[in-house]
Structure formats: structure tokens, C-alpha cells
Amino acid sequence: MLHQAFLIGAVYELEMSGQITKRLFENLNSRFYRSSGEHKFVSLIYGEISDAAQFRFLSAAQPFPLVFSAEHDRFMEVPEELCASFPPLGVLPSLDVIDRATTTSPLGFKDDYQMNEWLLMGAGDILLLCTDGLAEHSSGDARYFPDRLEQKLRGVKGHHARHIFEAIEADIRAFSEPSDDISLVVVKRL
């Protein structure tokens, strides 16, 4: 149901405004909050990259994207004011829900979603989107993220995105078998 609502909403938003807006996620959140059980939610990150390497995204309970700079050979720090994150869809109703007068929430209402906009990617830079399974991956007391991941990227940054992904995947498993699911998307600017 949520997937279909997203697809229909995305088509509508693209036709009406030429881009996906936070309004789509407000509507999805309201729909999911009203139609699901209290222990059900959806965490997600939605993003789009322009030809000019501007990255617009919305994060609902997902780790922030990482940008590995080919020029500086390290992860780039992103200022906190460029990093708005929100609770998962379905946990809290939106402040401006249409039927707010009849909507109850023991945990209160969430602030309006915001789209983050970054213009950080230079030639050869690598954008990583991942779930908390990668951010929390460990072997005993040793953690994979961020130092070992950054070291791996230094060694494979000259390759294409698929090779980078495969190298990270193999390195994660060599470090230790994951105890949580790990999702990873690798985007490389040419």
C-alpha cells in the first residue's frame, strides 16, 4: 500500500511542481500513521541528484549520507545545519495533518519534514547511503565504521561504483559476519 501511494504521489508531484517535495512525505506519514499498528513504522531515505551534483534528500530515521572526497582522500564533514533528520514514517502524526482535531497521539506530533540540500560532490567523489547495520557493524570491540570503511575507500576510489560496492561488501564480511542487515548504495561522480 505505501509503495503504491509513494509512486502515485511521486508522479503527481513531478507533474505539478517538477520535483518531489516534502508534502509527499507528510501525506505518506499521515496515511501510514492512520492505517498501521502502533508498532509499525517505515524508516527511509529519499534522494535525488541533479546534473550539477546537488543532492536533495529527506531522511526519516536513517543514517546521513557520507561523502568521500577523492581530492581530500577522506570523508567530508557536513555542517549540522545541513542535516535535518526525522522520526520514521508512521510513528508520529504531522503537525499540519488535515484532521488534526480528531487525531490523537500519545507521543505528540512531529515537526514538518525538510529536504536537505548538499552541493558537495566534486569529480571522483563517492556518495554512500547506508543503513544503521553498516554504521554499527563491529567485531568484538572493533568497529568497522568509519575508519576501516574510509581506509577501504582510499584503496578503491579510482574504480567505478559497482567495483567499490563489491570491495566494501567483501571487506565487511572479512571484518566479521554482519549481525544486522546492511543496505548500501554507492554513487560516484565521474
Could you tell me what each predicted segment is?
Residues 1-5:
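Conserved long alpha-helical elements within nucleotide-processing catalytic cores of c-di-GMP signaling
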